[in-house]
């Protein structure tokens, strides 16, 4: 399925780029990048393989725009990447590519919903449904993790999620298939 990557606390975007490119074999249908800095969320997505996105004029312009806004990458910068293998929702529709952002909530998803009665339009991404639901659990700066966790446990299929809300300074990672690998460096 899809590839989710992320790195927090590095000033050099090239470290993230190498990590994101390594995830390309997890999905060739589309890719996306999120940069979170001081509660500002910048994102780009396209129906391109990860390597094509990194070599695109669109990404170069995106990074120039961020630099024009004097955004400096530092130890509080989050870099997140997605490499999508199309399951539900056609990647030719940009609305289905990730990250999905709705009501100040950003979601990147690896997995597939199965047997979900809410999912009746299969031209739409199942991630859009998940994002809509997650956004309902954010109330200003408070996240209702208990009710979200009940919702997450009710999902049929396999899922790993990275999500945040622009009103919050927290980033959430959750999986129901135990496939989240991470490394923490105390430096």
Describe these PLM feature segments.
Residues 1-187:
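Conserved short alpha-helical segments that host acidic/polar catalytic motifs at enzyme active sites
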């Amino acid at each position: 399925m899809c590839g989710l990557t992320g790195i927090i606390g590095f000033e050099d975007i090239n470290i993230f780029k190498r990590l994101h490119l390594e995830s390309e074999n997890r999905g060739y249908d589309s890719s996306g990048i999120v940069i979170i800095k001081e509660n500002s969320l910048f994102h780009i997505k396209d129906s391109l393989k990860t390597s094509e996105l990194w070599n695109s004029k669109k990404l170069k312009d995106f990074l120039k725009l961020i630099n024009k806004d004097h955004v400096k990458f530092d130890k509080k910068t989050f870099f997140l990447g997605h490499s999508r293998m199309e399951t539900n929702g056609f990647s030719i529709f940009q609305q289905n590519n990730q990250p999905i952002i709705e009501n100040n909530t950003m979601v990147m998803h690896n997995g597939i919903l199965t047997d979900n009665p809410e999912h009746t339009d299969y031209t739409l991404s199942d991630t859009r449904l998940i994002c809509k639901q997650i956004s309902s659990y954010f109330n200003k700066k408070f996240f209702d993790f208990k009710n979200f966790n009940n919702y997450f446990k009710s999902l049929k299929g396999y899922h790993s999620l990275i999500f945040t809300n622009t009103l919050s300074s927290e980033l959430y990672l959750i999986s129901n298939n135990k496939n989240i690998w991470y490394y923490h460096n105390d430096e």
